[in-house]
């Protein structure tokens, strides 16, 4: 009797291991569902008794590539740990970005500290015309066609946050039309409305 019981116990253990493996695979897939971009890594020195203590900071952009994006700033003694903290911080600051057929609904300018970023809608196939920091935010947000220009500081942190402010200020054409009391056709480019209507059909 002892032998069959041991075999049964082993089968149960195998089932538990299989279940754990399946769950672990699902968790890994969930973790990699986001697009991550490391914009900047800096080394920071702190003067203490006996010398200097070094740490690293990481500016990270995380998004789902489908209208959700966030920015985080992590600090740790090692680069991988700083990036991991930045990713978690970015996820805590997720926000939704209005889009029409892969571009933004209207031109907008975002400002943060000395950073100033101008974004303009672009027709399909244009691509993301932007510098590194701006491109990281736009691609993580799932914006595929847009024109941009940095009008202020060259500081990457300021540029990223100015881009975030611009995206947060975007409104859907319906919202703009309702606020102004105008027909939808008067506040949104006809090409964008046709493209959206075609996608809906």
UniProtKB/Swiss-Prot annotation:
With S4 and S12 plays an important role in translational accuracy. Located at the back of the 30S subunit body where it stabilizes the conformation of the head with respect to the body. InterPro entries: Ribosomal_Su5_D2-typ_SF (IPR020568), Ribosomal_uS5 (IPR000851), Ribosomal_uS5_bac-type (IPR005712), Ribosomal_uS5_C (IPR005324), Ribosomal_uS5_N (IPR013810), Ribosomal_uS5_N_CS (IPR018192), Ribsml_uS5_D2-typ_fold_subgr (IPR014721). One of its GO terms (molecular function) is rRNA binding. The N-terminal domain interacts with the head of the 30S subunit; the C-terminal domain interacts with the body and contacts protein S4. The interaction surface between S4 and S5 is involved in control of translational fidelity. Residues 34-97 form the S5 DRBM domain. This is Small ribosomal subunit protein uS5. PROSITE patterns: RIBOSOMAL_S5, S5_DSRBD. Residues 1-28 are annotated as: Disordered. The keyword Transferase does not apply. GO terms for cellular component: cytosolic small ribosomal subunit. Keywords: Ribonucleoprotein, Ribosomal protein, RNA-binding, rRNA-binding. GO terms for biological process: translation. The gene is rpsE. Part of the 30S ribosomal subunit. Contacts proteins S4 and S8. Residues 14-23 have a biased composition (Basic and acidic residues). It holds the Pfam family Ribosomal_S5. Gene3D superfamilies: 3.30.160.20, 3.30.230.10. Belongs to the universal ribosomal protein uS5 family. The keyword RNA-binding applies.
């Amino acid at each position: 009797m002892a032998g069959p019981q041991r075999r049964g116990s082993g089968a149960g253990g195998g089932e538990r291991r299989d279940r754990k493996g399946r769950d672990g695979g699902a968790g890994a897939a969930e973790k990699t569902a986001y697009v991550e971009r490391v914009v900047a890594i800096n080394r920071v020195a702190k003067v203490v008794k006996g010398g200097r203590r070094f740490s690293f900071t990481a500016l990270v952009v995380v998004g789902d590539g489908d209208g959700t994006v966030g920015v985080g700033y992590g600090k740790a003694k090692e680069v991988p740990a700083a990036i991991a903290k930045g990713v978690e911080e970015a996820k805590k600051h997720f926000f939704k970005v209005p889009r029409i057929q892969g571009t933004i609904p209207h031109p907008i300018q975002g400002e943060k500290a000395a950073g100033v970023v101008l974004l303009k809608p672009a027709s399909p196939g244009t691509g993301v015309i932007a510098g590194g920091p701006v491109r990281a935010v736009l691609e993580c947000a799932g914006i595929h066609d847009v024109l941009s220009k940095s009008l202020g500081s060259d500081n990457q942190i300021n540029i990223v946050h100015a881009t975030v402010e611009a995206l947060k200020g975007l409104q859907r054409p319906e919202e703009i039309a309702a606020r102004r009391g105008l027909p939808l056709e008067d506040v949104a480019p006809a090409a964008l409305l046709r493209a959206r209507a075609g996608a809906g059909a």
